[in-house]
Amino acid sequence: MTSHQTGKIEVHWNDPSSGIFLSQTQRTSSTSSLKKSASSRRLVYGDDMLAPKPLAGQVLSKSPLPPFSPSKIMNRSISVPPTNISVPQISSNPLNLMKKSSDNDIFTTFNDTTNDCMNEASCEDVRHSLLQIIESKSNLSDSVHKMLGERVKTNLLLQGQLENMEGFWLQKLSQTCRLALTGNISEAKAFIVEIMCAGVVTNCVRWCPVLKTLIENLAI
């Protein structure tokens, strides 16, 4: 041993059975273990690290809230429409009754006019009525009245137009003559204009304006 050691040497530093060696060995082993674990440590985050952290004064519940169910909170009787309320019928409304009555009156008037217009008219009756208009007195001069009458005869009476005319338009023409001979000049003119504007009767553009002029100037 060195010269400065004066006491008795009880334990040699290199003696395996000495406490110095054991403590030194343990310290060395623990140090090396710490170094190894520190060098091989990896950053592994669990679910606790990824979970949101609560703010100050906020407490997060681990179990999520159940979904909102309106049926468990709201009263079911609110959403059910009442069944004890009596709704008045549409037909019992006074305004609807008045409108229905007005519509019926208009329909009845239309049917009456249509029935009068659609009465059975024969070619002979229409021919006789047209001749009465031609031979009646008018506010026109005799020469003009005679000329217009001849045009009606030529384009309507002498060419078989009445025999080839459809029943609907024949009845229209019959109603025109009846209205003209009874003094309803404006209504008769409306019928003759309707026939002329329809344009389905043969040669209507030739005799309709002439007949209309005769009707307008009848001295009845």
Curated annotation (Swiss-Prot):
It comes from Schizosaccharomyces pombe (strain 972 / ATCC 24843). GO terms for cellular component: cytosol; nucleus. This is Uncharacterized protein C24H6.08. It comes from the Eukaryota.
